[in-house]
Regions:
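Divalent metal-binding pocket/active-site signature
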Residues: 165, 171-223
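Active-site beta-loop-alpha junctions enriched in small/polar residues
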Residues: 80, 107, 135-137, 177-181, ...
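Bacterial Sec-dependent N-terminal signal peptides
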Residues: 1-18
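Acidic-and-aromatic substrate-binding clefts and catalytic sites of carbohydrate-active enzymes
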Residues: 80-86, 110-111, 183-186, 211-217, ...
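Polyanionic/metal-chelating signatures
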Residues: 117-121, 138-151, 178, 228-230, ...
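Divalent-metal coordination cores built from histidine and acidic residues
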Residues: 65-70, 74-81, 86-176, 195-202, ...
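Histidine-rich, glycine-flanked metal-binding segment
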Residues: 19-21, 28-73
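Cationic-aromatic interfacial patches
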Residues: 224, 232-236
């Protein structure tokens, strides 16, 4: 006699899990490069605990995202927030634009003591995440003031020590502002030596180049040379062409970046989406005015005949 087994199948549903926040019906862009899709996102204790089309959650707060895009927070890699942290710890200007993480210390300007800087940030309970580069200009000022000369070996070692300590304390790389005083007085090899220190701690090299106008191609090459010599990724800041005489040269500069990347070199660029810029007055002065440091600059500009020549330039 054969035994017959009868299985009774009963329909059942899984109980919905509890979350603090449930974002429903949004177009989800997850940041991986995949196409968007409709779905829900469940958040518990500040962390995503469910994401997808058919997740089962109830929540204390439900947000209807119909017709809206839901995405991870954006990273702004060029911000110059130094000095604003205490005035606006809520960082509304970033949050309202969907930016949740920023990089500061760009263009060679940063706090030199990173341990103190990060401790200050922690005490403010900022609403955004902050990473900082260590700025070459401030490192150089600390070691040798605004002198228009090469550093002595002792000064060079002091700069290297400052960069190393900054990287140990959490800096994410080295930035330069080679158009600004005193960075404009430095030679390429000086920057290479400091970049090698940051590279040992897996940092990135971010460059505000010496010039973004007539000599832009050679300055792009300098930025990439520094990266290659130090074996670190390069980020070229606010990639652009200054001066009407240079309009259209992006047909040359953009392929330079593409070619380097195709060859396996890690170089990236950032760009602001408008046709204005903000910088210091010194960048508009000719090299012969900037020679020999700030005291000499002030003395020259105090002379009426010099000011007339500068206006003509």
């Amino acid at each position: 006699m054969k035994k017959v087994f009868i299985f009774l199948l009963f329909p059942f549903t899984l109980a919905a899990q509890q979350a603090d926040i449930l974002i429903k019906n949004g177009k989800i862009l997850d940041g991986t490069g995949n196409s968007w899709y409709y779905g829900d996102i469940a958040i518990q204790n500040g962390k995503i605990v469910g994401i997808g089309r058919s997740i089962k959650f109830t929540a204390t707060k439900t947000i209807d995202a119909t017709g809206l895009i839901v995405a991870p927070g954006f990273n702004d890699v060029h911000t110059h927030i130094e000095g604003e942290e205490k005035r606006q710890p809520t960082a509304d200007n970033f949050i309202y634009d969907g930016v949740t993480s920023v990089v500061t210390g760009n263009c060679g300007g940063s706090q030199v003591n990173m341990a103190n800087y990060f401790s200050m940030l922690d005490s403010l309970h900022l609403s955004i995440n902050v990473a900082s580069l260590i700025g070459h200009n401030d490192v150089r000022k600390t070691a040798m003031g605004s002198a228009n000369r090469d550093p002595t070996e002792e000064e060079m070692k002091k700069m290297e020590a400052i960069v190393e300590q900054a990287m140990k304390d959490g800096a994410v790389g080295l930035s330069t502002g080679l158009i600004y005083i005193p960075g404009t007085y430095s030679k390429t090899e000086e920057v290479v030596r400091l970049a090698k220190v940051a590279s040992a701690y897996h940092g990135v090299y971010a460059s505000h180049m010496r010039d973004e106008g007539d000599s832009v191609t050679q300055d792009i090459e300098e930025a990439m040379h520094i990266g290659r010599e130090s074996k670190m990724p390069v980020e070229i800041s606010h990639f652009k062409l200054s001066g009407q005489q240079n309009w259209g040269r992006s047909k040359i500069t953009v392929p330079m970046i593409i070619k380097a990347r195709e060859e396996g070199f890690d170089v990236t660029i950032d760009q602001y989406p408008y046709t204005a810029s903000s910088t210091s007055l010194s960048t508009l002065l000719p090299d012969w005015v900037l020679a020999d440091g700030q005291d000499s600059i002030k003395a020259r500009l105090a002379k009426p005949e010099i000011r007339k020549q500068v206006i003509k330039c």
